[in-house]
Amino acid sequence: MEKSCTIQDVFERFYPSYEKRNSPPAHHRKTAYHIMNCKTGAFGVNISVCEDCGCISIHNNSCRSRCSPMCQEFPKEKWIDAQKENVLDAPYYHVVFTVPEELNSIIYSNQKLLYDALYRAASATLNELAKDAKYLGANIGYICILHTWGSAMNYHPHIHTIVLGGGLDDENKWKETGGKFFLPYGVISKVFRGKYLDELKSLWNDSKLKFHGTAEKYQNSYRFKELLDKCYEKNWVTYCKETFNGAQSVINYLGKYTHRIAISNHRIKSMTDTTVTYVVKDYKNEGCWKEKTISGEEFIRRFMMHVPPKRFVRIRHYGLLSCRNKRKKITHCRNLLGCKKYISTLKNLNAVEMIRVLYHIDVCKCSSCGGNMVSPRKDKYSSSFRAHMRC
């Protein structure tokens, strides 16, 4: 019998058999454990009692995994809020760098190496072209975010880049080209293709690449060269989405991409003893949503393809927005443009305070009578109780 479900439900039902059949790596097992036990009490609980009516509130802690659908809201809100101090009232563009599907098997076999290479190639492309006086002639700033999935949770590594539509020239003066994106898409595509394939060849020459599964055939130097030749001949898809202007619209837009995972709970429609049904975008039919049914273990396999390598940094800042530059140079840009500084509202707030600011809910007040919620234990160093609620 079918029932509506969450990602956690799917993992509880199908992950044990998936693990027995596939022997996943340690960081995959850890991710699965986090998802299955998030907000179940396995990561601790926080208990508070109303001083007036005695009502008891029990809050199960989250796992805080970046792959858990229940743990993304707070990190996303805090990250976006922190960016307010670095966003200018200036044009911004959303550029997406993709690679041919022929490279997927090699990239998946060498995730850390070739994901890093994606960032380097995208960054080098934007820096080189933006500094060229033919296009802009300035140092720009941008944020790169790696996504590895398509709508059906298929493997589709690509880089989303939020690009500031102007920069500082050699005389430290602000320079922009107006409403139109300053780099031709065809030029971006060709330069990015050359730089990424150069990265790939360099890693091959240094014998740093590994070849697993369908990538094993590329251990042969002739097959590897054939692959590179084929990729050189293809037109790589690099495109720029609709531009947006103004700091607040940029901040809101960023939230769509920064803390996404491969699939969210609301896209899962049903689960049986053997299958999972979820909705995907049908790009052959103008992006309409349609239902797709796959086996439960296949769902787990697809989800696990998008667990990032251990300690991998998905959100990276470059140019004017890099940690080294943004304090002085963004302040200088703001002064040149005459725009105000946006002040962070969530900085240094704890979970209780964030809930109060974001959702206008005071978890330190009893939901039954409005009394104060306190810890059931009295602090021996204090004459008062302290509410202890942690998300």
Enumerate the language-model features and the residues they cover.
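Beta->alpha loop/short-helix hinge microenvironment recognizer with preference
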Residues: 1-391
